[in-house]
């Protein structure tokens, strides 16, 4: 919420990140807001926020830059884990099937493919046409499991699972909000690590 803030108080956290776009069946297009699901975007965001805070608070710049470097190093470690663990999967198993096209940035970075029921959140999410399209795609793509995000209706993917004959993995992916403190997605670090753990467990044969 940026109400009441002027431009000098706002930071473009995703500065330098190439946007990716979503389209609905009618051709409407919007920027995919889920860039943060990609750890490399998290690294860029950490750099941008650290630089902006250090500039805004020069008297605390040294401390800010130190903490920013620590946070960046943590994200670089997560990025390395994503590259190693996803890279160890056979190419044909690097197919992530989820309800919405939230993981567009992440799959592009780590050499995966995402299939989905819908791209843009609308009142028609999980329509018969969308479900049928994904089921047809899954005649050729046969991942070990399908996935459902923690914040979406599970019914459309259950229909896909039944028609395609592919089970849904029992742990959800996280695509939007953090979880409550102390949960598996209670911090951004936990959020990213939880998604990697879930993906690998669900895709590895």
Locations of regions flagged by a protein language model:
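Extracytoplasmic metal-acquisition and chelation regions
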Residues: 1-205
């Amino acid at each position: 919420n940026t109400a009441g803030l002027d431009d000098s108080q706002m930071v473009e956290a995703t500065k330098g990140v190439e946007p990716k776009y979503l389209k609905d069946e009618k051709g409407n297009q919007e920027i995919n807001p889920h860039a943060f699901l990609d750890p490399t975007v998290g690294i860029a965001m950490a750099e941008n926020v650290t630089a902006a805070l250090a500039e805004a608070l020069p008297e605390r710049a040294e401390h800010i830059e130190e903490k920013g470097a620590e946070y960046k190093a943590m994200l670089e470690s997560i990025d390395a884990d994503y590259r190693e663990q996803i890279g160890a999967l056979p190419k044909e198993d690097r197919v992530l099937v989820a309800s919405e096209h939230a993981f567009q940035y992440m799959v592009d970075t780590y050499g995966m493919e995402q299939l989905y029921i819908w791209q843009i959140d609308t009142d028609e999410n999980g329509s018969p046409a969308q479900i049928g399209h994904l089921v047809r795609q899954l005649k050729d793509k046969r991942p070990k499991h399908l996935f459902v995000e923690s914040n979406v209706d599970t019914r459309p993917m259950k229909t896909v699972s039944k028609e395609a004959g592919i089970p849904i993995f029992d742990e959800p992916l996280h695509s939007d909000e953090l979880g409550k403190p102390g949960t598996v997605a209670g911090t951004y670090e936990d959020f990213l690590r939880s998604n990697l753990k879930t993906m690998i467990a669900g895709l590895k044969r």
